[in-house]
Amino acid sequence: MIKLEKVSFTYKNRAALCDVNVDINEGEAVAIIGPNGSGKSTFLKVLNGILFPSSGRYVFDNNEINENTLKNNKFLKLFHKRVGFVFQNSDAQLFCSTVFDEVAFGIMQMGLEGEEVDKRVRDCLKLLNIEKLKEEHPYNLSGGEKKRVAIASVLAMNPEVITLDEPMNAIDPKGKRFLKELLIDLNKSGKTIICATHDFEYIEGVFNRAVVFSENHKIIRDDRYENIISDREFLMECNII
């Protein structure tokens, strides 16, 4: 479903990704692990078509994703319907005047009818347990509440692939447990989950695979999640713990 071939990304002459090769199949739950500055966020932004490889190829469902293909508005809308992104900083994706409007914004761009929009929004608000916040301004919410709104706005699009950048940040322990169970349920329903994280305590049982980035912005290990997390010597050598 997702294939990166020798992908590198350079920003202002500084490498952020180096020669990345990875395949992710439909329905997998993959943790993206690495020390700060190793390229995890850049990797997710490439997957979402926010950044484009400086070299190499990114192929999604047999279509190469680059600046030219995403200039096609029809293809762009379809791509962003199929691949959703929850940013590390929720403020970066919350801009509407109410929570209800925030969750409705993306699906309204898809041309859905009012009744369908209303149903999807209400279903997602209920799923994230934020129905009581529907008339609130997103900027007045706590960090954990903002994260739930951001996730609801992505789920309203019903994407096949859900990518998340450090979703446990700014969430209290109860919220982290809720999010863990949500990710497990979403994956069981067939969603592909790709998540950058360092919060290992709260994500046990979510992922079946982990991809590890090094401080040199390269993938240095791709293995079962349990094998990597149990290898404390490896994690310490990589400056992850």
From Swiss-Prot:
Question: What's its EC?
Answer: 7.-.-.-
Q: Which UniProt keywords apply?
A: ATP-binding, Cell membrane, Membrane, Nucleotide-binding, Translocase, Transport
- Sequence ranges assigned to domain ABC transporter in this UniProt record: 2-241
Query: Where is it chiefly localized?
Result: membrane
Q: How does it sit in the membrane?
A: Peripheral membrane protein
Key word Cell membrane present: yes
Please list the GO terms describing molecular function: ATP binding; ATP hydrolysis activity; ATPase-coupled transmembrane transporter activity
What does this protein do, in the record's words? Probably part of an ABC transporter complex. Responsible for energy coupling to the transport system.
- Family stated for the protein in its record: Belongs to the ABC transporter superfamily.
Q: What is this protein called?
A: Putative ABC transporter ATP-binding protein CA_C0773
